[in-house]
């Protein structure tokens, strides 16, 4: 059981992350032992579809991603998410190809704000932290995590920022929810 494994194993991560697929697999196989891995995956995707009210990009997201790429910037996604839920949403919104690489926490065993999650990206791509900036909408997982590895950050308060999220101490703060400001800096 993935949940029991994660809670019982001493982990090197301060913010461990489970992969929900083994949980879906256990539930599905209990009722249908012959279910295929593909069917388990599809069941996980369907749970997300059924329980999600809306999937859309923030205004100016595509413009910012395109603008950064045109400016020669590398763009990476570091997401606290389950791949089974998130990948189809990234594809549906048409932004997968806008990233140079995508790191999803369920694949890595840890999540933001764990510095190790950031280090996996930094080390894989040999990034110079002084040349990087984390853009996020959560003062704890996004901004504090970036600061923990010495990375500058840009905070955008959005409709899904944690309620009463304090304005973080970081290089840039945009409280109007418009990620488009990124292109102005």
Question: PLM features: residue spans?
Answer:
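N-terminal helical cap/lid subdomain that shapes the substrate entry/recognition surface
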Residues: 1-59, 63, 70, 84
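Asp-based, Mg2+/Mn2+-dependent phosphohydrolase catalytic module
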Residues: 37-38, 42, 62, 66-69, ...
């Amino acid at each position: 059981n993935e949940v029991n494994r994660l809670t019982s194993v001493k982990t090197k991560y301060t913010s461990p992350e489970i992969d929900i697929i083994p949980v879906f697999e256990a539930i599905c196989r209990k009722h249908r032992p012959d279910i295929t891995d593909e069917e388990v995956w599809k069941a996980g995707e369907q749970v997300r579809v059924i329980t999600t009210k809306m999937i859309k990009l923030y205004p100016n997201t595509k413009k910012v991603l395109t603008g950064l790429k045109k400016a020669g910037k590398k763009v990476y996604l570091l997401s606290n998410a389950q791949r089974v839920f998130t990948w189809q949403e990234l594809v549906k919104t048409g932004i997968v190809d806008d990233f140079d690489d995508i790191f999803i926490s369920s694949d890595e065993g840890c999540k933001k704000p764990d510095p190790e999650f950031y280090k996996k990206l930094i080390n894989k791509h040999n990034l110079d932290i002084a040349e990087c900036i984390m853009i996020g909408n959560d003062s704890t997982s996004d901004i504090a995590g970036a600061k923990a590895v010495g990375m500058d950050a840009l905070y955008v308060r959005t409709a899904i920022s944690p309620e009463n999220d304090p304005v973080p101490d970081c290089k840039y703060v945009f409280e109007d929810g418009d990620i488009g400001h990124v292109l102005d800096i």
